[in-house]
Amino acid sequence: LGPDIVSPPVCGNELLEVGEECDCGTPENCQNE
């Protein structure tokens, strides 16, 4: 994916996007506080 690709912030894609507090790889892992 290039910088011109726009995607919504998703917790689980291993990328920390704007608006995300964590991105640990999977939605389950991201629920760990």
Curated annotation (Swiss-Prot):
Give the regulation of activity: The fibrinogenolytic and coagulant activities of the moojenin were abolished by preincubation with EDTA, 1,10-phenanthroline and beta-mercaptoethanol.
Q: Which cofactor does it need?
A: Zn(2+)
Q: Where does Ca(2+) bind?
A: V10, N13, L15, E17, E20, D23
Q: How does activity depend on pH?
A: Optimum pH is 4.0.
Uppermost EC category: hydrolase
Keywords noted in UniProt = Calcium, Cell adhesion impairing toxin, Disulfide bond, Fibrinogenolytic toxin, Hemostasis impairing toxin, Hydrolase, Metal-binding, Metalloprotease, Myotoxin, Protease, Secreted, Toxin, Zinc
MF terms (GO), sorted A to Z: metal ion binding; metallopeptidase activity; toxin activity
* PTM section of the record: The N-terminus (from the N-terminal region of the metalloproteinase domain) is blocked.
- The disulfides recorded in the entry are C11-C30, C24-C30
**Function, as annotated:** Metalloproteinase moojenin: snake venom metalloproteinase that cleaves both alpha- and beta-chains of fibrinogen, but not the gamma-chain. Shows a coagulant activity on bovine plasma about 3.1 fold lower than crude venom. Renders the blood incoagulable when intraperitoneally administered into mice. Induces necrosis in liver and muscle, but does not cause histological alterations in mouse lungs, kidney or heart.
- Homology family: Belongs to the venom metalloproteinase (M12B) family. P-III subfamily. P-IIIb sub-subfamily.
**What protein name applies here?**
Zinc metalloproteinase-disintegrin-like moojenin
